[in-house]
Amino acid sequence: MHLLPTHDEVVRVLRDTGALRDGHFVYPNGLHSNEYLQVPLAMRYYQHAKTLSVGLSRLLRANSEIRAMIPELSIVAHATGGLPVAYGVCEALQAKRVYWAERDSENQPMRFRQFIEPLPGEQVVLVDDILRSGRNLVELKALLESYGAIVVALAVVVYQPNPRTANFGDLPLLHVARLEASYYADAASCELCLKSQPIEKVWI
């Protein structure tokens, strides 16, 4: 595998580990799709986790502005999906800090652990395993900015946009692979439903 894995190499890893599957899936937000993607299924395997994280770190290092920040850069994720990627990227970059935000329960806002407080002016890269709707990254970005931290880039293993994907404006968005899936707003508009293809609900 290349130092920076190609799109086809990433897809092969995802399929070989069961992280990427074809079928008829309904996500928690109600969207229907012809693909299931859960990157943690690939991140279970150390070598794959290392390859994907190092590949992402190389994309960050290739950006001259971000490269200049590395000695003081923080890598921040949300629990739990982004944690393996965050640690892998931080190690490969030799960035200064890695930490995360979490929720007490599903409907609670994100927060940092006691005594973990981003510093005003702290330069941060937000990291996650996948960007689909971007809801978690939007909330995490707002949380960091409430402390005065500066988000300088987003870095995700897989970018799989859908009709509800957040707009992050001019903020650099780096990804090892971009995947396109067919999305349908509801059962009435879903071609897979019209074909009576069996449904599998995605619960996480």
Which ranges hold each PLM region?
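Active-site-facing substrate-recognition patch
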Residues: 1-66
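Short, glycine/charge-rich flexible loops or terminal/linker lids adjacent to PRPP-binding catalytic cores
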Residues: 80-125, 132-135
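PRPP-dependent phosphoribosyltransferase catalytic core
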Residues: 2-12, 141-204
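Glycine-rich helix-loop-beta junction characteristic of Rossmann-like nucleotide cofactor-binding loops
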Residues: 60-69, 115-119
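Conserved acidic residues
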Residues: 73, 122, 152
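Short glycine-rich phosphate-binding loop at a beta-alpha junction
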Residues: 66-79
